[in-house]
């Protein structure tokens, strides 16, 4: 997209300050909360918020509240996005400030991952019980079966497989299946559940949802069930999941609609308190998928949460990125 001379000046003016340029570099890596940005930059919240406000007013970043937290990400459709991208590409990776920011971002990610993995390890044995605390699991599973369709599917890949429930739920509709998870404790339980279900052609593997190592277009059904709200970069996870979807294949995502159960961050390591359609659908479209179903399952009690199910299909004639992430 071409910009007017005045638009270029506005973009450069907004980005043309060292802290704001560092903020853009960090947000180019992933969405981050204001508190995380303050910690990485070692600056006060009022100061960081002021810089973020200027970047948002220039259309370079997007602000989105999530419960009591506020997150920022690079604006997806900003007219100045390409210009900023070129500016960031010019920065030397060895620049002391940028390198220090990258190191601190790595620390934040590591601590986030350690906390989540410790939580999963502690709770693996009672995972199905925990998963059912705020939703009617039977209703959700029935809706997932309807949304997935009868199949049969040649290959089902479940990302963030947890205790293996999606594998056993959909097991009779898939010729073969693969579940990936970072938690060995979860994988051990999933193996037991898969064995009990008699699913001989179902493999459990230690793997990262952001970099699965699987070839593009390898599955005609990919599921991501109650995983995104734990992740620091859900958009990247959706992109990787979509990359695995074969032509005419289906991606099924189940997660919470936005809610205000703030205690879930500490009690259950939720990073995000649900997702708007306005987030998920553009991520699917950007990955080359077409939305097929958008289902909301309201809670049966005041304490419950609304569950959303999004399904999207890759058009039969679409090209697929084959290389593994």
Task: Give the location of each predicted region.
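Amphipathic alpha-helical dimerization/coiled-coil segments
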Residues: 2, 79-128
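N-terminal helix-turn-helix DNA-binding core of bacterial DNA-binding proteins
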Residues: 6-46, 69-78, 143-145
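Conserved alpha-helix/loop element of class I SAM-dependent methyltransferases that forms part
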Residues: 135-154
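Class I SAM-dependent methyltransferase SAM/SAH-binding core
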Residues: 155-157, 162-211
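A short acidic, Gly/Pro-enriched loop at the edge of an enzyme's catalytic core
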Residues: 210-222
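A short glycine-rich, Lys/Arg-flanked "PGG" loop and its adjoining helix->strand segment in the class I
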Residues: 235-250
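C-terminal alpha-helical "lid/dimerization" subdomain adjacent to the S-adenosyl-L-methionine
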Residues: 250-306
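Core SAM-dependent methyltransferase catalytic element
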Residues: 296-325
């Amino acid at each position: 997209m071409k910009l007017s001379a005045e638009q270029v000046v506005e973009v450069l003016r907004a980005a043309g300050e060292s802290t704001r340029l560092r903020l853009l570099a960090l947000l180019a890596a992933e969405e981050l909360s204001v508190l995380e940005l303050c910690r990485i930059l070692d600056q006060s919240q009022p100061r960081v918020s002021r810089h973020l406000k200027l970047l948002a007013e220039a259309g370079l970043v997007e602000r989105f509240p999530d419960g009591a937290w506020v997150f920022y990400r690079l604006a997806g459709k900003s007219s100045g996005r390409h210009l900023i991208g070129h500016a960031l590409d010019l920065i030397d990776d060895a620049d002391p400030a940028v390198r220090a920011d990258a190191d601190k971002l790595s620390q934040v990610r590591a601590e986030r991952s350690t906390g989540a993995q410790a939580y999963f390890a502690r709770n693996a044995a009672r995972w199905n019980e925990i998963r059912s605390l705020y939703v009617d699991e039977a209703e959700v599973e029935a809706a997932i079966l309807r949304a997935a369709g009868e199949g049969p599917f040649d290959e089902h890949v479940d990302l963030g497989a947890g205790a293996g429930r999606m594998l056993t739920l959909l097991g009779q509709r898939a010729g073969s299946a693969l579940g990936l998870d970072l938690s060995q404790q979860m994988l051990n339980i999933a193996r037991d559940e898969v064995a009990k279900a008699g699913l001989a052609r179902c493999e459990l593997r230690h793997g990262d949802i952001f970099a699965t190592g699987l070839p593009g277009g390898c599955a005609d059904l990919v599921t991501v069930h109650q995983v995104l709200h734990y992740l620091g970069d859900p958009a990247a996870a959706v992109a990787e999941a979509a990359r695995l979807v074969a032509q005419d294949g289906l991606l099924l995502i189940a997660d919470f609609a936005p809610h205000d159960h703030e205690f879930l961050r500490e009690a259950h390591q939720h990073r995000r308190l649900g997702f708007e359609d306005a987030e998920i659908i553009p991520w699917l479209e950007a990955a080359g998928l077409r939305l097929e179903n958008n289902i909301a399952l309201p809670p049966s009690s005041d304490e419950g949460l609304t569950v959303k199910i999004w399904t999207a299909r890759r058009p039969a004639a679409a090209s697929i990125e084959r290389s593994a992430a």
